[in-house]
Amino acid sequence: MSQLHARDYEPNRSGTLDGVRILDLSRLFAGNVLTQILGDFGADVIKVEPPEGDTLRAWKTEGIETHWKVYSRNKKSLCLSLRDPRAIDIIRKLVPSTQIFIESFRPGVLEKMGLSPDALLALNPSLVIIRISGWGQDGPYAQRPGFGTVIEGVSGFAAINGFADREPVLPPMYLADGVAGIYGASAAMIALREVEMKGGRGQIVDLPLLDPLFAILSPQAANYRLTGKVKPRTGSRSTNSAPRNAYRCSDGHYVSLSGSIQKMAERLFRAIGRPELVDDPRFRTNSDRLRHADELDAIIGEFIGARTQDQNVAFFEQAEVTIGPIYDTPQIMADPHVITRELIADYPDPDMGQLPMHHVVPRLSQTPGAIRTPAPALGQHNRELLNEIGIGDDGYAALREANVICEAPNKAAPAKRQSSL
């Protein structure tokens, strides 16, 4: 039985971004992360989906759209066949009431659709246009496919990830997309602030996957210029400080430990009953410890390997040494800190009964976000949005018949929470 707190959706909650409408034509992960963040704080996110649905829907587990459910909460779904000029006309009619427009087509495709930035800004001069791509809107690689896997290689991430005697390691998740989505949410707010402060000037945000990921990977270029050396793959070790590693415990679990400052390293040596290591020439300074990392890890690993994960965490926390358990998902979901702060909570779901989802991030004291609505069914909000631009029942039926608009055949209602009484 789940230990997570049971929460319900809060459809009547307001947010800081109430009144900010986002028209999101992007696909897959980066755009969905971006709009999930802003939607959590009240933005009116209209997810424009093709007849087959956003490609994120295809990432299923046991036949269930878990990615879509988590990252498309607080959104509306408008399903349009954008190959039809009538669908493009619908987009144009929605643009004047929109503050942020997002797309992730290959550079030039939006222009071919008749929705160039100039055309959009003519309809709404205050519009913020976010263009997500792999490589950016210009440059030699602009027309290359821009999947995150490729970007994670070119950015330098894979080259520094893994072990020296093994192949470079790509991340086991969509890191480039996720980082771009977070940067994109920041960019959207910066550009929107410009609109508010300087008299309504909209602008274009060029958001490739490559630039944000490279930006967080340490000062690689500066370090290379200074040393002429490429940062090696060091597994869980650091090239900046030692000790720092993942250590195996007696129960097969692992802990992560860092003695990155001198006082912490000395405290660690005393805690494991080896005070003489403080003055050992191999370990006296951080530079010494880096040169003798194998010997240092062997000493620490022997101590940790004789104890379980829980024993190690309790021991080193008592000694005020920086350590933490390396969790798998079941451990995360059972952790008292995670449960108490509701980092994850259970929400009602028609397919799973209860859907564990991450909390709104970040947490604001005066204007916290909220999970107001579950992820929508395909085309769930077609009628509402088309009615807004003057398309009534007859017009809707004609567009539906012509396959300009589409909807899920059976849109399930959100699950009702069962009473505990």
Regions found by a protein language model. Name each.
Residues 243-319, 323:
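Aromatic-enriched alpha-helical interface/lid elements that frame and gate functional surfaces
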Residues 181-202, 215-227, 269-275:
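Oxidoreductase and adenylate-handling cofactor-binding alpha/beta cores
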Residues 318-372:
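A glycine-rich dinucleotide-binding beta-alpha-beta segment and adjacent secondary-structure elements
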Residues 68, 234-239, 245-246, 352-355, ...:
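Short Gly/Pro-enriched turn/cap motifs at secondary-structure boundaries
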Residues 169-179, 200-204, 233-238, 242-244, ...:
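A short glycine-threonine-serine/GTX helix/turn-capping micro-motif
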Residues 201-210, 315, 397-400:
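Beta-strand segments within the central parallel beta-sheet cores of soluble alpha/beta enzyme folds
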Residues 1-198, 233, 377, 383-421:
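N-terminal helix-loop segment corresponding to the beta1-alpha1 unit
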Residues 52, 135-136, 209-214, 251-253, ...:
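Glycine-rich beta-alpha junction loops
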